[in-house]
């Protein structure tokens, strides 16, 4: 379901950092990294975010700049990384790849005609999370002693499962699909200035007079990352149809419509591949020297791009006591 459509249904409210202080947040690593990656590329020179051999390391700058926001508000992040891409999501991945390739061509044209503003905007659209980006991010998080969980499939689904089990307090993601995966509470806008936004699953269901299963059915009718929706159906129409007919199958029968792999899509949200075999530590004891050396020496990031962030991490971890006990 498109983010704009699902946002219309979600129960959202601004929440002060003080109100969630002391919490553990399962962060959708892919979602968080992508936002910092595109932002870093916009405001950082090429020399700062690529090595001499051309390897992109903007993610390391993003991690160092982004982590202090958690620590300064006494929040413990747990980064949940995606596993393999599900077969049903391959088409979306291909579409994103095509969009990136088109953006690369447009960026080159903008640079050729000297339009620096357009080139800068297009550059952010060309970003992708490579295996090197994932591995270097893991390397830095490990040196900072930030917990990492490897999901068998969708990171959002794994993060939601951890919240359902009570192992974490919130899921951290900008994606509204966390509602469909059953996350009780999602904290949004963790990469933005100002206070975050809290998304509440039970209030969403109550406000829309839906069960979670019916919310998933509404999403499938509108379209998700795993399927195309029914033409002409938006969230209001989908809710009305579900209220009238009860579930997805009855709506499809009544409208004489068909959604390919609808049963599998439904299962991916309601019974996704997740694991309960993980060890979660919430005591943060970063090796700052090792982290600095990894970023500056091993990956050639200019020290002046990250030193302020490292100082904030060091200060905030000690001040909040994250290195002792959460």
UniProtKB/Swiss-Prot annotation:
Cofactor: Mg(2+)
Region (N-domain): 1-100
Organism domain of life: Archaea
EC code: 3.1.-.-
Keyword Nuclease: yes
GO biological process: DNA repair; DNA replication, removal of RNA primer
Entries under SMART domains matching the protein: HhH2, XPGI, XPGN
Binding site for Mg(2+) 1: 28, 82, 154, 156
Cofactor note: Binds 2 magnesium ions per subunit. They probably participate in the reaction catalyzed by the enzyme. May bind an additional third magnesium ion after substrate binding.
Binding site for Mg(2+) 2: 175, 177, 225
Any one Pfam family match given in the protein's UniProt record, by short name: XPG_N
Keywords, comma-separated and alphabetical: DNA damage, DNA repair, DNA replication, Endonuclease, Exonuclease, Hydrolase, Magnesium, Metal-binding, Nuclease
Function: Structure-specific nuclease with 5'-flap endonuclease and 5'-3' exonuclease activities involved in DNA replication and repair. During DNA replication, cleaves the 5'-overhanging flap structure that is generated by displacement synthesis when DNA polymerase encounters the 5'-end of a downstream Okazaki fragment. Binds the unpaired 3'-DNA end and kinks the DNA to facilitate 5' cleavage specificity. Cleaves one nucleotide into the double-stranded DNA from the junction in flap DNA, leaving a nick for ligation. Also involved in the base excision repair (BER) pathway.
NCBIfam families: fen_arch
Subunit-structure text: Interacts with PCNA. PCNA stimulates the nuclease activity without altering cleavage specificity.
Family of this protein: Belongs to the XPG/RAD2 endonuclease family. FEN1 subfamily.
Protein name: Flap endonuclease 1
Source organism of the structure: Haloquadratum walsbyi (strain DSM 16790 / HBSQ001)
Lineage of origin: Archaea, Methanobacteriati, Methanobacteriota, Stenosarchaea group, Halobacteria
Gene coding for it: fen
């Amino acid at each position: 379901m498109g983010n704009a459509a699902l946002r219309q249904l979600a129960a959202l409210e601004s929440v002060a950092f003080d109100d969630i202080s002391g919490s553990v947040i399962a962060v959708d690593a892919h979602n968080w990294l992508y936002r910092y990656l595109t932002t870093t590329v916009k405001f950082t020179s090429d020399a700062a975010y690529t090595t001499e051999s051309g390897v992109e390391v903007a993610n390391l700058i993003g991690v160092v700049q982004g982590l202090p926001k958690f620590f300064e508000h006494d929040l413990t992040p747990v980064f949940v990384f995606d596993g393999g891409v599900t077969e049903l999501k391959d088409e979306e991945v291909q579409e994103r790849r095509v969009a990136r390739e088109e953006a690369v061509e447009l960026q080159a044209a903008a640079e050729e005609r000297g339009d620096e503003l357009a080139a800068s905007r297009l550059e952010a659209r060309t970003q992708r999370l490579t295996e090197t980006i994932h591995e270097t991010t893991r390397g830095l998080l490990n040196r900072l002693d930030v917990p990492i969980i490897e999901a068998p499939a969708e990171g959002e689904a794994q993060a939601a499962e951890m919240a359902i089990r009570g192992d974490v307090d919130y899921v951290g993601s900008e994606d509204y699909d966390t509602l469909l995966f059953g996350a009780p509470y999602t904290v949004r806008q963790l990469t933005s200035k100002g206070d975050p936004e809290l998304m509440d699953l039970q209030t969403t269901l109550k406000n829309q007079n839906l069960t979670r299963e019916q919310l998933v059915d509404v999403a499938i009718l509108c379209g998700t990352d795993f399927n195309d929706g029914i033409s002409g159906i938006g969230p209001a129409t989908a809710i009305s149809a579900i209220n009238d007919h009860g579930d997805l199958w009855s709506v499809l029968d009544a409208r004489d419509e068909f959604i390919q792999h609808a049963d599998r899509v439904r299962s991916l949200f309601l019974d996704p591949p997740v694991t309960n075999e993980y060890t979660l530590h919430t005591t943060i004891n970063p090796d700052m020297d090792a982290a600095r050396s990894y970023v500056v020496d091993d990956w050639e990031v200019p020290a002046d791009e990250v030193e302020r962030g490292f100082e904030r991490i060091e200060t905030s971890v000690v001040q909040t006591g994250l290195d002792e006990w959460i």
